[in-house]
Amino acid sequence: MIYEGKAITVKALESGIVELKFDLKGESVNKFNRLTLNELRQAVDAIRADASVKGVIVSSGKDVFIVGADITEFVDNFKLPEAELVAGNLEANRIFNAFEDLEVPTVAAINGIALGGGLEMCLAADYRVMSTSARIGLPEVKLGIYPGFGGTVRLPRLIGSDNAIEWIAAGKENRAEDALKVGAVDAVVAPELLLAGALDLIKRAISGELDYKAKRQPKLEKLKLNAIEQMMAFETAKGFVAGQAGPNYPAPVEAIKSIQKAANFGRDKALEVEAAGFAKLAKTSVAESLIGLFLNDQELKRKAKAHDEIAHDVKQAAVLGAGIMGGGIAYQSAVKGTPILMKDIREEAIQLGLNEASKLLGNRVEKGRLTPAKMAEALNAIRPTLSYGDFANVDIVVEAVVENPKVKQAVLAEVEGQVKDDAILASNTSTISINLLAKALKRPENFVGMHFFNPVHMMPLVEVIRGEKSSDVAVATTVAYAKKMGKNPIVVNDCPGFLVNRVLFPYFGGFAKLVSAGVDFVRIDKVMEKFGWPMGPAYLMDVVGIDTGHHGRDVMAEGFPDRMKDERRSAVDALYESNRLGQKNGKGFYAYETDKRGKPKKVFDATVLDVLKPIVFEQREVTDEDIINWMMVPLCLETVRCLEDGIVETAAEADMGLVYGIGFPPFRGGALRYIDSIGVAEFVALADQYADLGPLYHPTAKLREMAKNGQRFFN
């Protein structure tokens, strides 16, 4: 053994060839934390000191290669002064450079996922051989930063600036065949041939058949582009990427600027450019929010995994109520491998559900994400039925009938008598109390809520609602099924609106107040879209459905009359009474035309102004900042109340629910992280400025206490 640490070992393989293996003890994956970086330095020193070494193969003892840096260390590291961040990155790069500068050839054997620092380690090697099942990429832009271990320097010098910009700015994982095509790897082999492939390359390099020094040289030099080529490549890319990323996500464009600035430098000077740009991005609020989001997501996955121990295996599912929603649920279950019965009392509803599932599967085939054979397999896994004949072996039933408590209670009581005693019943409801629905059941311990968001195939969140009598097994089984469907489940306790809708309706309440104060709804939409929402509140209401919003508003007002009940008519009342129901009937706040692709396109319709005129009670002058605060303060305060009331267990789950469920701007991190970014004391003072707007704007006593004590939601 040439070197042995807790993360890295170096041992002889054969005839002067050694294996530098990453295998971080006590972890399921390899990652570049402080320990691993320090051991890499020591391992490289040990190799350099051993005259018998003729070549190095870099490998992994895990199923993955290296997943990247240890993101948990970013939180503290990024609080350091910018100059210290630059120094830290340059120190790390000295280690990578020392490996790259070894006087012997090096080959990276990529067995699994190699992301971020993992790929940057591979780029420092002379050759890369990749398993057909592996994936590589530089996803740092998704964290609001860009590669900091040489990725912006080595990758463009290996695969060309255009390809490198595409890889770095998109941040996606790349398949082996795509990596080979652009020259990011030198060979692709079957998983069982990976070591043999690496040995073949290293032996050919040792023998002189391959000139490893010539292969290494371009990574040490400036980019081979003249001034005109640079201008065309970089200026065009910056314009395109800026349009794609938008103004709230600076990292992709900053990565291009770094590559451009370093284009005329050799490796060492280019790495200084990279380190300076990386440190600048690391200090932004966008990076802080996106890293927080990543850590929240990891926390969600850990919590969901904890349910696996007691969850029952779902081998056969069923959905009650076909149509668009039922068809979407059936599609999601079938395409992820769980056969599902789709029951309705009407043949036309069954056909609608099958058409929806077939359309979604066909779209995946068209995009190359599914083979025709897999599409047929998924369609065969959806069994339509008008009766309960095959329900005896169903493990979970998702009830997705009309949003009416009496109808739901009747359907749930009926199906309970048709399934086995331990089958789970789950109601896909957005507003109706799970405890209320449970009263109709003989086995309420087997009953939970399972709230899907529309459209089911696109929205990642599922709220699993625990009722007073829901058993841990029922909750765990539903969480496991949601995960199996490819969703991100969050367990919440029962209350009107649960988490997401309870928080969303105060946001709509702020919007209603603005419209009643004479503020143009088109202006409100533009301001909130600029703030970062995927669509403004008026457009969102149209997409959700004015009738749905009207019903939900009434449910929330009944549940929380002290702050959500408003005796005055609102914009939603006016539209609902005028049968302007949104996209579903072609007119709401906006009117809707069909574009060339058959999708609804919103257009301004002046007739809506006459509809809204009776509910405008004043003409108040407000700034764009006021608009944001009228909307965001009640949303944030309701999120605080959900956490305080125990509706959601952690701040991480609350924030992720809003990001996944209603498109809360990811670069702002979620409602509670947004409060943190302002400062809790500052947010309380801000809310107090709008106290005259009503109880939705009044901070809780506990939040005031947090402000007084200088506390945060995330430390």
Curated annotation (Swiss-Prot):
> Could you give the subunit structure recorded for this chain?
Heterotetramer of two alpha chains (FadB) and two beta chains (FadA).
Q: Return any one Pfam family short name.
A: 3HCDH_N
Q: Which PROSITE patterns does the UniProt entry name for this protein?
A: 3HCDH (PS00067), ENOYL_COA_HYDRATASE (PS00166)
InterPro entries recorded: 3-OHacyl-CoA_DH_CS (IPR006180), 3-OHacyl-CoA_DH_NAD-bd (IPR006176), 3HC_DH_C (IPR006108), 6-PGluconate_DH-like_C_sf (IPR008927), ClpP/crotonase-like_dom_sf (IPR029045), Enoyl-CoA_hyd/isom_CS (IPR018376), Enoyl-CoA_hydra/iso (IPR001753), FA_oxidation_alpha_subunit (IPR050136)
Give the residues the record marks as binding substrate: 297, 501, 660
Swiss-Prot/TrEMBL catalytic activity: a (3S)-3-hydroxyacyl-CoA + NAD(+) = a 3-oxoacyl-CoA + NADH + H(+); a (3S)-3-hydroxyacyl-CoA = a (2E)-enoyl-CoA + H2O; a 4-saturated-(3S)-3-hydroxyacyl-CoA = a (3E)-enoyl-CoA + H2O; (3S)-3-hydroxybutanoyl-CoA = (3R)-3-hydroxybutanoyl-CoA
One MF annotation (Gene Ontology) recorded for this entry: 3-hydroxybutyryl-CoA epimerase activity
Described by its record, this protein's role is as follows:
Involved in the aerobic and anaerobic degradation of long-chain fatty acids via beta-oxidation cycle. Catalyzes the formation of 3-oxoacyl-CoA from enoyl-CoA via L-3-hydroxyacyl-CoA. It can also use D-3-hydroxyacyl-CoA and cis-3-enoyl-CoA as substrate.
Write the protein's name: Fatty acid oxidation complex subunit alpha
HAMAP family recorded: FadB (MF_01621)
Sorted UniProt keywords? Fatty acid metabolism, Isomerase, Lipid degradation, Lipid metabolism, Lyase, Multifunctional enzyme, NAD, Oxidoreductase
Q: Which organism is it from?
A: Pseudomonas putida (strain ATCC 700007 / DSM 6899 / JCM 31910 / BCRC 17059 / LMG 24140 / F1)
Please tell me where NAD(+) binds in this chain: 325, 344, 401-403, 408, 430, 454
Q: What is the lineage of its organism?
A: Bacteria, Pseudomonadati, Pseudomonadota, Gammaproteobacteria, Pseudomonadales
Residues forming coiled coils: none
According to the record, the residues making up region (3-hydroxyacyl-CoA dehydrogenase) are: 312-715
Spell out the Gene3D superfamilies in the cross-references: 1.10.1040.50, 2-enoyl-CoA Hydratase, Chain A, domain 1, NAD(P)-binding Rossmann-like Domain
